[in-house]
Regions:
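HIT superfamily nucleotide-processing domains
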Residues: 1-138
């Protein structure tokens, strides 16, 4: 993994507004927030994408992500939020270090806007083959 802004934050070379830290995870406010309280949750392990993250780091994030989300909601007064996690440039990952966005959604206009354009023509036969392939890859 190349040098990232998150690596510099983890080393203390760039300041951040920390909201949580333990041995495996750091959470801090996003400097380009989509809404008030937009928080980034990152592993201290230098993995680029979620599939490259160790099980231990993934478990550490999984344990604290709900807790941090509850704190963001309480502090901002929002009642809805999105959790966003992008993997790779095609998926709009801007910083090549695994990170989760907790983005409060205080109103219809504020926060993350999401469009959903599902594939047309779901094929159950193809889905069965794909499901077996995914299960076999586990």
């Amino acid at each position: 993994m190349g040098e990232t802004v998150f690596a510099k934050i983890l080393r203390g070379e760039i300041p951040c507004h920390r909201v949580y830290e333990d041995d495996h995870v750091l959470a801090f406010l996003d400097v380009g927030p989509l809404s008030r309280g937009h928080t980034l949750v990152i592993p201290k392990e230098p993995a680029v994408t979620l599939d490259a993250l160790s099980d231990d780091s993934a478990a550490a994030i999984g344990r604290v992500l709900p807790r941090i989300a509850r704190a963001v909601l309480k502090a901002t007064g929002a009642t809805a939020f999105n959790v966003l996690q992008n993997n790779g440039p095609l998926a709009h990952q801007a910083v090549m270090h695994v990170h989760f966005h907790i983005i409060p959604k205080p109103s219809a206009d504020a926060g993350l806007g999401v469009g959903w354009d599902p594939l047309v023509g779901f094929d159950h036969g193809e889905a069965a083959v794909l499901a077996r392939a995914i299960a076999a890859a586990l």
